[in-house]
């Protein structure tokens, strides 16, 4: 996998924690436009965050991604999960404060490595 791209203009605000982690974080994996990091407050034995390079506040703005970017992001989720040895896992998106989103930079949670609670 390729290293994350260097900062591109104003697409990565200085005041966004996830933009900073995209640029400077301890990445588990990286590919063009996306990185994976470990969640600092894990809710499962393995709890990773998939961060896009592009600063998009939440899943509500997913339409700003092309179909190809969205596909690459989901393929990256599967690659990272496999690399971590996960065969059974959850992919979760919190879209907005009422859903539990606390950092307003689109990100996907990948949780696995043990039962993480029942979800229908």
Which residue ranges define each predicted feature?
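HIT superfamily nucleotide-processing domains
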Residues: 1-120
